[in-house]
Amino acid sequence: MQEVIIYSDGACKGNPGRGGWGAVLVAGTNEKELFGGEANTTNNRMEMTAVIEALRALKRPCTVQVYTDSQYVQKGISEWLPGWKARGWKTADKKPVKNADLWQELDTLVQPHKITWHWVRGHNGHPGNERADALANRGVASLAS
């Protein structure tokens, strides 16, 4: 399987508010940058969208290293998701899972890949994360009239 590194980030001006997402995909010497924005969203939805769009860009099953500064994404996919699914997309408190639409999409997109999830401290000089952050901010800026 091809090895791919994904750096992802989301940004939001207001929460909720205008948001953007960005991702950098690295496969050997090839790199691809992705970004986009949404007019009325949250920081967590943008963090998730960054990973979703990056995984959508993969055309075949890959071994993937995902780097995110979102503990919500990292813990959600690594720790919370199995329980949510077992409880019919309810939290341990029996409340509906927030962003269930995106979690379900992410759950589908991860299936063909072998993914290792990494949390990195945001705005701490990590080059891949800094690039993803800049792309997420471009996504926000793309919405400015």
Curated annotation (Swiss-Prot):
Keyword line: Cytoplasm, Endonuclease, Hydrolase, Magnesium, Metal-binding, Nuclease
Subcellular location: Cytoplasm
GO annotation, cellular component aspect: cytoplasm
Protein residues bound to Mg(2+) 2: D9, D133
Any one GO molecular-function label of the UniProt entry: nucleic acid binding
UniProt-listed Enzyme Commission number(s): 3.1.26.4
Enzyme class: hydrolase
UniProt KW Metal-binding keyword: yes
Family label: Belongs to the RNase H family.
Subunit structure: Monomer.
Full protein name: Ribonuclease H
Species whose genome carries this gene: Cupriavidus pinatubonensis (strain JMP 134 / LMG 1197)
